[in-house]
Design a protein with these regions (language model features):
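Class I S-adenosyl-L-methionine-dependent methyltransferase catalytic core
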Residues: 1-184
């Protein structure tokens, strides 16, 4: 696996050796960031990577101009891999790795971010809790199915794309405002 774009494009990422973690493919990550460009996220964006695994999505955001990324995963091996990737790429100072259950983390930390990624294991059934508690302007959900906001009127679906088995749902907060410049 590698960083697809930005200043770290082409650099290799270590992955976690466990069946519970399913890394986002290079192709899907590139497509996700192409979709995000149209939303003109702020330069220096604050990013939250939930169920971070190897940290590929959060690291990709840093490579493309995000100022800071918080990466959350409950798996100790995943957190060690993320920390090793950040160190190898020389970007540890722009990221924070937190070992925690995502639900507990979101309940305790409501700091706003510009962009959040949520890439839990397939068959995850806590999507409504994530939608209710994540404080982001844009939420990228990767799952085995489309994630619909349902009765949560804070979110609207911007795009849905399938990349083999994974389905990427891009949600935008209805009340998000503020100056926008591109996250390239």
């Amino acid at each position: 696996m590698r960083v697809v774009g930005g200043v770290l494009g082409g650099r290799r990422l270590e992955t976690v050796s466990t069946d519970a973690i399913r890394p986002t493919s290079d192709r899907a990550r590139e497509a996700i960031f192409n979709m995000l460009v149209s939303l003109e996220l702020p330069d220096g964006a604050r990013v939250l990577d939930l169920f971070a695994g190897s940290g590929a999505l959060g690291i990709e955001a840093l490579s493309r101009g995000a100022a800071h990324t918080t990466l959350v995963d409950s798996d100790a091996a995943a957190c060690r891999t993320i920390a090793a990737n950040l160190t190898a790429l020389g970007i540890s100072d722009r990221a924070k790795v937190i070992r925690s259950d995502v639900g507990r983390y979101l309940a305790a930390h409501g700091d706003p971010v510009d962009l959040a990624f949520a890439d839990p294991p397939y068959r995850f059934d806590g999507w409504s809790d994530v939608l209710d508690t994540v404080n982001a302007n844009v939420l990228v959900c990767e799952s085995d199915r489309e994630i619909e906001p349902g009765s949560n009127h804070a979110w609207q679906t911007h795009r849905v794309r399938r990349y083999g088995t994974p389905v990427v749902t891009l949600l935008v907060r209805r009340d998000s405002t503020g100056p926008r410049t591109a996250l390239s």
